Amino acid sequence: MKYLSLASLLAIAVATPVAARQLTIEDVTMLSRAGAPAVSGDGHWLVWQQRETDIAADKGRLDLWRLDLSKKGAKPEKLVAEADVNESAPQFSADGRTVYFQSDKGGDDAIWAIAITGGAPKKLTGFQGGFGGFKVAPTGDKILVWADRLPGAPSLAPAMVKKAADAGAGRTYDQLFVRHWDTWSDGTRSQLFVLPLTADGAPGDGVAIEHGLVGDTPSKPDGGGEEVSWGADGKTVYFALREAGRIEPLSTNLDIFAASADGSTAPTNLTPDNHGMDNLPTVSPDGRSLAWFAMARAGYEADRQVLMLRDLATGQVRALTANWDRSVGSIAWSPDSKRIFVTAEDTQEVPIWSVDPASGKVVRLTGEGNITAVVPTAKGAVFAMNSLVAPDDFYLLTGKKVSRLTSVNAEKLAGIDMPTVTHFSFTGANNDKVWGYAVKPYGATGKVPIAFMVHGGPQGTSNNSWSYRWNPALFAGAGYGLVAIDFHGSTGYGQAFSDAIRNNWGGWPLDDLKAGLKAATTKFDWLDADNACALGASYGGYMMNWIEGQWADRFKCIVQHDGVFDARAMAYETEELWFDEWEHGGHPYYEDPAAFEKWNPVNYVASWKTPMLVITGERDFRIPYTQGIAAFTALQRRGIPSRLLVNPNASHWVLRPKDSRQWYHEVLGWMGRWTGKAAE
C-alpha cells in the first residue's frame, strides 16, 4: 500500500502567499488547537472542539465547530462560540440531529444541547459542584456523568462535594496518596452517576452506580471518557478502576467492571485474575463484545498493551494481539462491529491499524504522522493527525484513501517555511538498531548549532508529532539543528527494547545518545558538531543531570527541566511509587539502595562543569521542585554558570500561555548565550 505523506497533504492544503519566514514562539503560542472530534451516525456531520489562546487572560478558550461532510468543498463553521465561555466534549445523539456538549456558561459546568443545524443551545443539567465529563447512552434516554465526590456518595448532591472543614488550615492524612500529579488529596474520588435524559433535560442529582467501590473513574491524573463505555442497550456501564487503599501508590492494577446503569446491583469485576493494568473498555455497536487492553505485569505502567475481547453472552475472553509486538493505544469499533480501529506506535510514527475481531489479523491503514483521535464511519474513519511540522487537522479515511478535511491553521501558518525532517538509524548499545531524526532549519546555509533533545518517559518516544511544550520546529525556526534519539527504553520498537532501560537508566540510553549524536554529525554536514547544547525534561531532565557527571565536556550548555537529581530523595518524594520502584528493580530504596545509587546523578556532582539552566514547577508532585533546587544549589556551590526558573503555576508540564512563552524565551536565551546564536 502506498501512503500519501502528511507533508504532501499539507502542501496540497496550504498555500504560501506572503514572504517566507521561520516559526516563532508567538506563532506556536497562538495556534488554534483542534480536537475531540465527533461524527454523526449517518456520516453527515463532523463536530469538534477548538481552542483559541486568550493571551491577555493567560488561558485558552474552547468553541465548537462543525463541518458538513456531505458537501464537497464545505467550509468549517462555528456551531457554538460565546465570549468568555468554554464549550467542549461534543457528542451526537443517536439520530445525529443533536449535539450534546459541556459548557461553563454562568460559572458552573453543565451539559447542554444544540441542534446540529444551529439555533439556541439548551441547558440540560443543573446540579452543582462541578463534574469531569459525560457520555450519553446509545439509547438516548440516560447520561453517564463522572464527578469528584466523597466516597460512597449516593448522588451528585452538593453535600457530597467536600468533607467538613478541619479546625485549622492544615491537612491530615493516614495513608498515601497525599497528593497526585499537581493536586493535594481532598478526600473525594471521581465517581460515576447516571441521570435520566428526557425532552426537558436531565433533572435531578442522578444515582451512583459503583456501590461503595473506592477509587477514581476515570483514573487520575490522565483518564477521560475512553475509560468508560455504555452497553449497547443502555442498561450496563463498563469502566476501569483501581481500588484504593494502602497499596494504591504501588499498584497499576486497574480492572474492568460492569455496573447496572440503574444502580440496583453491585459492579462485577471482569478481570480479577490479571494484576497488571486493564483499561479502555469499549463495547461493540452490536452489543456482543467488549474490547479493552491488558498489561501482563503488575506494577509496570509501560508493559505491552494487548487488545482483549470478551464475548458478553458467554464470557469467553481472547487475546487478539498476543503475537503482535506493539502496544494498543486507543480502541474504536467500526459501526458494523466487524473491525476494530486501534492506534499503536511504530518506529517514530503513530498510525491507524485495523484488527479483525474474529482472527486478530492486524493491518496498517495509514503511513507517516501522529494519529491522536479516530472516529469510525460506515466507509472508514475520520481522524485527527499531526506531525513534527504540522499541528492537528482532521482527515478522512475511505478504504485505503486519505483525504484532508480541514486546514485549521492555514492563515496562521501562511508564509512560514517549516524545517526539513530526516529520520536515520545507527547501531547503538547491545548492537541494536536505534532510530533518531534530525531537523534542519529551512534555508540554512553553512553549519548550525545543535539542540540535542532527550525525551521523557523514559518509556516514550521522539516521534513524528507536534508539541506545544517542546516543539522541534520552533527550535529549528530559532536557527538550531535539532537531533533526537529513541534510545533503549523508547516505545514503538517492541517490548524488549522498551524493557531494556529497567535498572539501566544511565547505561544503554547514554551509550545510544553518544552513538546517535556521532552518527548525526557524521551524516549531516550542516550540523556544527562542536557547538551543541543538550536539553530534556522528566527522564530527559534526569539524563541532563547524568550527562553533567558522565559526558560533561561534550556540550556548550545544558537545559534541565523537572529531572531527577537525587534518586534517594526521589524514592521518598514522588507519588506514584510503582514507577520509581519498578524502574530500579522492583524494590523500595531501603531494601536495595545499590539499585538506586548506581545511576544516581548526585553521586557525580564533583565532575559537573557544564553551564546549566534548571527549570522546575512548584506544583510538580511527580518530580518535586526540590530536586531542581538541589541541582541548582550544586551548580552554584561549584561555581558553574547556572540559572534557575521556578514556575509557581507549573506541574510536570508548563501549560499556561504566558508561562510557555516565558519558558521558550528562557531556554532559547540560555542556549544562545553559550552557542553564540542570537535568541528571538
Model-identified regions with their sequence ranges:
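Hydrophobic beta-strand positions that form the internal "hydrophobic ladder"
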Residues: 43-46, 96-99, 143-144, 237, ...
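Short loop/turn segments that connect beta-strands within beta-propeller blades
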Residues: 69-72, 115-119, 197-201, 260-264, ...
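Cap/lid segment of the alpha/beta-hydrolase catalytic domain
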Residues: 298, 408-530, 537, 570-572, ...
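Non-catalytic accessory segments flanking enzyme active sites
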Residues: 38, 144-146, 169-174, 178-197, ...
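Residue-level detector of Asp-centered blade-edge/turn motifs that repeat once per structural unit
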Residues: 41-42, 94-95, 138-139, 232-233, ...
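Active-site-proximal cap/loop segments of hydrolase catalytic domains
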Residues: 484-680
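A flexible loop/linker signature enriched in serine peptidases of the S9 family
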Residues: 50-63, 80-87, 100-112, 126-132, ...
